[in-house]
Amino acid sequence: MIAFDTNLLVRALVADHDDQVAVVRQLIASDTIFLSRTVLLETEWVLRTRYRIPRTDLSAFFAALLETDNTLIEDADAVSHALDWYAQGADFADALHLAACGSAVMHTFDRDFCKAARDAGIAPELRVLEV
């Protein structure tokens, strides 16, 4: 098994450097690929901000990763929940943080995060702290 850094995963999608894409494809064909939650988080940010890839395309890309036979995603159930919420309009980072909490109650000062989660019908409990 080999672990991918963000730049390898980005190359796999955007295919903007032929030599690097060839290496990434060879790695994918040769071994099981481990993707950490942090790599997924950074990949979403890079693809959204630098490459301006639309949310629907990002959702499809990450959903396909979950279904790929030779890919092992850290905490795949939490990532799957986060992707469901992301598809409903939640921020990917917020959704992933919340999904990773499991049964723990997420506490935050971020009212917008709390409101967006509730509006999207996201089930885990989320509390805004007042100061």
PLM region descriptions:
Residues 6, 76, 92-98:
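Conserved glycosyltransferase catalytic-site signature
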Residues 8-9, 42-46, 61-64, 81:
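A general alpha-helix detector
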Residues 30-32, 70, 102-106:
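Short active-site oxyanion
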Residues 1-35, 50-60, 68, 123-131:
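Short, well-structured N-terminal submotif of metal-dependent ribonuclease cores
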Residues 37, 61-87:
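Acidic catalytic patch
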